[in-house]
């Protein structure tokens, strides 16, 4: 009887590992935050360059940032979201703009 229980435990462990491996990754929202100094054209440029939006959609999102204080640029896995946030913030600083990009769990 001991062997049967060992196999059941092993099977249960294997099923749990497979279930854990198949879980979808955690997703994160990448958010642009409004400020009073970054030009609207620069925000549109950021949305096109880093999020691949066309000029029309980038303009809509820029206006959402401007009037609502922030807007979600996209939802990504943690690694992608962290990379996009870092790249946008670096690009903004290199161009001497205070634009802030953040992330939060979706």
From Swiss-Prot:
Top-level lineage group: Bacteria
GO function term, MF aspect, one: molecular function inhibitor activity
Pfam name, any one: ClpS
InterPro entries named in the record: ClpS, ClpS_core, Ribosomal_bL12_C/ClpS-like
Single GO biological process annotation from the record: response to heat
NCBIfam families given in the database record: PRK00033.1-3, PRK00033.1-5
Complex formation: Binds to the N-terminal domain of the chaperone ClpA.
Family the UniProt entry places it in: Belongs to the ClpS family.
Entry function: Involved in the modulation of the specificity of the ClpAP-mediated ATP-dependent protein degradation.
Name of protein: ATP-dependent Clp protease adapter protein ClpS
Organism: Escherichia coli (strain K12)
